[in-house]
Amino acid sequence: MDPGYINSYGKTLFKYLSDYYWRIEASGLENIPGHGSGILAGMHRGFMPWDGVMALHLVVSKTGRYPRFLTHSGLLKFPFLANFMTKLGGVVACQQSAERILSSGELIGIFPEGIRGAFTRYREAYKLQGFGRDTFVKLALQHRAPIVPFVTVGSAEIFPIFAKIESKCWTRYTEWPCIPITPTFPLLPIPLPSKWHTRFLPPMDVAREYSPEAAQDRAIVRAISREVRAKMQQAVDEMLARRRSIYHGSVFKSEEVA
């Protein structure tokens, strides 16, 4: 991670994208822990890492903390993305990386749906996929770290996936499950200027209710995971119900916006 690099882009490219291109409105940033470890569990759409980058920008600019996001190894196979993501603090998504970050008292960003969420077809973009092995819950229990779920409405529209092309060669090289077909990708990989709304939900302090040993209890881990997913889905549904346009308007009350 290079804080100077992040701060430089935070005043230029990231600020432009956040404030003018996607016009991001954020709510609940006060829920980010001011110190110590914590897990930011998000919903990733659009297959490119822009929603993670914008979440990083929001947290850094509003709280001064620098979360490290777990990054799919496929993104790091592209040289121009590998350097970019590494300087932003991205680390290869694996348990060892997560353990190291949490043990250092840092924030970690995780997308529990995994790569399936990133490649969700647009017609199902705002229905959360399954959370896989629930490793993020086990990490929260073992490291006594609060879980802060967060969701974004609007990021699915930057590269809305209408079709997928299966290609073994493409998958072998990129580790992507398919070639996504959107209005602009792959012919012109420019994201669309949709309006974004990001909400950070109240932290779930699992350490208050469970001991670290609970990480070995499959039933407890699954129950916590389902609770996280349910809260995220409820937040998404509420935001969608308030959204009147993909490109304009707000889903938050004025006092909710950071």
Language model features: what each stretch is:
Residues 1-9, 100-258:
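Non-catalytic C-terminal accessory region of glycerolipid acyltransferases
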Residues 1-58, 63-96, 237-258:
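Membrane-anchoring hydrophobic helices of lipid-metabolizing enzymes
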